[in-house]
Amino acid sequence: MDRVLSRADKERLLELLKLPRQLWGDFGRMQQAYKQQSLLLHPDKGGSHALMQELNSLWGTFKTEVYNLRMNLGGTGFQGSPPRTAERGTEESGHSPLHDDYWSFSYGSKYFTREWNDFFRKWDPSYQSPPKTAESSEQPDLFCYEEPLLSPNPSSPTDTPAHTAGRRRNPCVAEPDDSISPDPPRTPVSRKRPRPAGATGGGGGGVHANGGSVFGHPTGGTSTPAHPPPYHSQGGSESMGGSDSSGFAEGSFRSDPRCESENESYSQSCSQSSFNATPPKKAREDPAPSDFPSSLTGYLSHAIYSNKTFPAFLVYSTKEKCKQLYDTIGKFRPEFKCLVHYEEGGMLFFLTMTKHRVSAVKNYCSKLCRSFLMCKAVTKPMECYQVVTAAPFQLITENKPGLHQFEFTDEPEEQKAVDWIMVADFALENNLDDPLLIMGYYLDFAKEVPSCIKCSKEETRLQIHWKNHRKHAENADLFLNCKAQKTICQQAAASLASRRLKLVECTRSQLLKERLQQSLLRLKELGSSDALLYLAGVAWYQCLLEDFPQTLFKMLKLLTENVPKRRNILFRGPVNSGKTGLAAALISLLGGKSLNINCPADKLAFELGVAQDQFVVCFEDVKGQIALNKQLQPGMGVANLDNLRTTWNGSVKVNLEKKHSNKRSQLFPPCVCTMNEYLLPQTVWARFHMVLDFTCKPHLAQSLEKCEFLQRERIIQSGDTLALLLIWNFTSDVFDPDIQGLVKEVRDQFASECSYSLFCDILCNVQEGDDPLKDICDIAEYTVY
């Protein structure tokens, strides 16, 4: 190997292969390293073209030189010194070379016997070699020839070329290796065939120990016959050459009659060279089924690419394998299992207490089953069991006597849940649109009713609590332990849907009637002291404007009829003249929102979106650019109103939008506008149908200051005060027939608490700037609302 390459080339090749020097000559590792470095140095893989070219050149030279070296060892390598016996002579070694320098290492030779006897004596000194028989002593040295004999008709030595004559392999002479040959390797055409039953002796490969062929050929050459004799030979004695010394019985290559009967048609149709091939297998008479029986389709899961787990499975295979799986399925700890036969196959149905994937069960069964195997999960175990235990299926065995329906059903437990509808009705009845407020009420309802302090007092400001506590106590207990409290309250607070539906289905007169009815019901529940307090507010309003009851009636008519350009109302006057209090009372009575129109123009869109589904809106404290009173601050409110004339005019629908919601097209509701002494442009002035000029009245301000409860309880800003003013000054015929009875009842109630003369005394106290209830009711009796 040191002469294969020069020292420099050898070191360069090892460097390119990245191998240490001690691995030089290890062809296997060098070839593996060459393949790895080829992947790294190939130009298409990002390597160096020059290094790849150098590696290919050195490797090609190395392979060529190694090939030539091995070829040159054929006649000179071991002539003078046979392996492991170079020091001993020919007679001492127990074997002698033949004419082609071959030293016999084959089974049964003298050298083979001596070597193994020496080996056994090392371990057992008393070992004695078996006695030699006469036959074995005279038997020539045998050699097992392992290369194929490819001659189709070797009976005639003249038909076999000289280079294809049989030869013996010399283990002392290196043979050419195709793996390192520069030429492409030849495709092997040899096939292994069984050794004939009549062959005897150690060779059995078709060559005599003396170099002769079993077919009578001389074996002086080094080549083998091109083709072996046909397996089904008819002329056994002729082909065998009639030699008894070869160790083969005459006719040993004759075919078996059973093989002839099975392959008769095949042997007649095939060529002479095809007898070396394995005969084709016969087709199965009963092919494996492709799916479960159709009667089980409705009870099985047909999901293929799913990781879902199941507790019940059905395995379909052969009867023998199903019986084996029935005994070994204990890995999954089945609670129930049964073995069923169906036609030529079997089925294993089992249930487990834990869930498993179908792939896990199938993979386990496939380790024990080489025949067809199908496994699916059972979605309806009880129904599937009833089918597989009836005809045409046959139940073989089961680990317990059957399945029953009660094993799959539990007794229904009454699991009460929170009534979402009840919570939504509670919010709708009490006009609650704040989710947190609804949650607070319901958590408060979870307390015990008998020990509730709020219910025992029955205060007016707590009437929502003590009126609904007992009704919602049971549902509140479930709500207390519910995980979806916020979701329930958010849905209940979404009263916008019912309000929008009401706006579509009801007229504005009906909506006004409903609002008045709600106010009258609240007034009906007031006590005597609270009734006098609200009558004081009525007296204060009657002193605010001249003929105030008629003015209020006209305002309600304008806002209810909602005629374009005949619906908007303007309250204008100096500071502290009662504009804001009256506007707030109207919003409370009719239901609406107050808007800030003085904001920048880019924020007006969301501010106006608050007006969705409202009966009326109030533009509070609008500021203008030109003030009649120089002490007033200018603002952009009037300019914004001028730019939004089409919006609040009420002629066409406009798009109103809120945050996190889409725009909605609707008519903008009528508005009540309050402002100080600002100059209005003609375009804005034309949109107001009623203009009320307020003036400062010191006696009204003094009356409010002296009656603390009118301000603290916001009696002036309450819509119930305006509703009481209407029923106090108008007959019941003015109201809707549906609420005339309630109007009369509430009026009689207040008339019993306060006579007309007493009301006149209250009115006089207001006009004089005193406490409205002076000398009429003790202030300590007032109930805080």
Swiss-Prot record:
Top class in the EC scheme: isomerase
Keyword set, alphabetical order: Acetylation, ATP-binding, DNA replication, DNA-binding, Early protein, G1/S host cell cycle checkpoint dysregulation by virus, Helicase, Host nucleus, Host-virus interaction, Hydrolase, Inhibition of host innate immune response by virus, Inhibition of host interferon signaling pathway by virus, Inhibition of host JAK1 by virus, Interferon antiviral system evasion, Isomerase, Magnesium, Metal-binding, Modulation of host cell cycle by virus, Nucleotide-binding, Oncogene, Phosphoprotein, Viral immunoevasion, Zinc, Zinc-finger
DNA-binding annotation, residue ranges on this chain: 293-406
Matching InterPro entries: DnaJ_domain, Helicase_SF3_DNA-vir, J_dom_sf, Lg_T_Ag_Polyomavir_C, P-loop_NTPase, T_Ag_DNA-bd, Znf_lg_T-Ag_D1-typ, Znf_lg_T-Ag_D1_dom_sf
Principal localisation: host cell
Compositionally biased region (Gly residues): 199-209
Modified residues (N-acetylmethionine): M1
Start and end residues of each SF3 helicase domain: 547-707
Region (Disordered): 74-97, 145-291
Cofactor binding note of this UniProt entry: DNA helicase activity requires Mg(2+).
Function, as annotated: Isoform large T antigen is a key early protein essential for both driving viral replication and inducing cellular transformation. Plays a role in viral genome replication by driving entry of quiescent cells into the cell cycle and by autoregulating the synthesis of viral early mRNA. Displays highly oncogenic activities by corrupting the host cellular checkpoint mechanisms that guard cell division and the transcription, replication, and repair of DNA. Participates in the modulation of cellular gene expression preceeding viral DNA replication.
Name of the protein in its database record: Large T antigen
Organism placement in taxonomy: Viruses, Monodnaviria, Shotokuvirae, Cossaviricota, Papovaviricetes
